[in-house]
Amino acid sequence: MAVPKKRTSTSKKRIHKNIWKRKGYSIALKAFSLAKSLSTGNSKSFFVRQTKINK
């Protein structure tokens, strides 16, 4: 089993954590932007099939 040899410093931990958070934030922002464009109908990259409901 792999075991780290030295303790990771607090500043390095913080740096790694911030990078990880930033990645998540940017992905969430892209997803939100895509959802917004789909809901308004301005999407150029997604084609949503419109289905007509007959009553």
Swiss-Prot record:
One of its GO terms (biological process) is translation. It is found in: Plastid, Chloroplast. Coiled coil: none annotated. The keyword Ribosomal protein applies. Pfam families: Ribosomal_L32p (PF01783). GO terms for molecular function: structural constituent of ribosome. Keywords: Chloroplast, Plastid, Ribonucleoprotein, Ribosomal protein. GO terms for cellular component: chloroplast; large ribosomal subunit. InterPro entries: Ribosomal_bL32, Ribosomal_bL32_plant/cyanobact. Belongs to the bacterial ribosomal protein bL32 family. This is Large ribosomal subunit protein bL32c. It comes from Nicotiana tomentosiformis (Tobacco).
